[in-house]
């Protein structure tokens, strides 16, 4: 019998602070029209000081667990895609693992910027197909607002903060 991976549950977390393009007009040589015509972006969410990458990832993970009707200890592994970890080490994935109270399995980060979640999902799929895990929490979480150059209009208008999570199951 062929093992297939399916998405069993999903969740997300967006910080409360919403920043629309007009806020950038005050500090940069730009306009809502310039930003939206080039990027399609009208608004983005920015994390506050307490909303770290691992905190947002944990909140998205809890929502995914609830959506899948699973408990945290049902999870065999966590793969977290991020380029904005809270610390150099430990990995953000192990911080989420601890936040959820998971004491078994493995957890690691994937750092591939925009493609990170896709790579994390591909990793999880391969682990499930190979029989190494049955339920994997795959998360993408970023806090780019904490490291952006606020004077570079070509980049600072593009990024926001948030987290999304899925549970991939055999």
Please annotate each region the language model reported.
Residues 1-76, 100:
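Conserved "HGTGT" condensation-loop signature of ketosynthase/thiolase-family condensing enzymes
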Residues 1-22, 119-170:
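Conserved beta-strand-centric core segments of catalytic alpha/beta enzyme folds
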Residues 36-55, 82-136:
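Conserved catalytic cysteine-centered active-site region
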Residues 79:
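N-terminal Rossmann-like NAD(P) cofactor-binding module of classical short-chain dehydrogenase/reductase
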């Amino acid at each position: 019998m062929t093992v297939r991976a399916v998405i069993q549950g999903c969740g997300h977390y967006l910080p409360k602070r919403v920043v629309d393009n007009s806020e950038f007009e005050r500090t940069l040589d730009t306009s809502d029209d310039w930003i939206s015509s080039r990027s399609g972006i009208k608004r983005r969410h920015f994390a506050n000081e307490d909303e770290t990458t691992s905190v947002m990832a944990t909140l998205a993970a809890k929502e995914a667990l609830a959506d899948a009707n699973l408990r945290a200890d049902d999870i065999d592994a966590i793969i977290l895609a991020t380029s904005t970890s809270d610390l150099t080490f430990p990995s953000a994935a192990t911080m989420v693992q601890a936040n959820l109270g998971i004491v078994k399995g493995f957890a690691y980060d994937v750092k591939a910027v925009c493609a990170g979640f896709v790579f994390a999902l591909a990793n999880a799929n391969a682990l499930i197909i190979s029989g190494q895990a049955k339920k994997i929490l795959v998360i993408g979480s970023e806090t780019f607002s904490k490291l952006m150059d606020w004077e570079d209009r070509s980049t600072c208008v593009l990024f926001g903060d948030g987290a999304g999570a899925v549970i991939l199951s055999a």
